């Protein structure tokens, strides 16, 4: 009986350790490696390009510091079943045509950041509004 209890406790302990894995962080390039950020509103197509290094650093930092992993998976090139979203494209210094994208959108009164095939994170509404506000400047 003691052996059975010991094995049961060991299995539960291992299960708890594996179930409490580290939360995945959004993967963005270093601001110094980015030459331009392009924000495009879908479906309108309104676009703004940001090349000022201080503003690029602020956007990258705001997204990195204000996202929380939802555990959701991204299986598409862009958000599925979301009609209106922002595409935030990052263009890098090191290779011509090398870029990455994060989609920002609102769904059921919550705001999200999604990286294709990587994951979905909650993003603070203030950051979402600040980035989307750049289209109106």
Residue ranges and their predicted role:
Residues 1-9:
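Positively charged n-region of N-terminal signal peptides that target proteins for export
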Residues 16-19:
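C-terminal motif of bacterial Sec signal peptides marking the signal peptidase cleavage site
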Residues 21-23:
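Bacterial signal peptide processing site
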Residues 25-34:
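N-terminal helix-cap/turn-to-beta initiation motif at the start of protein domains
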Residues 92-137:
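Short, well-ordered, aromatic-rich surface patches in folded extracellular/luminal domains
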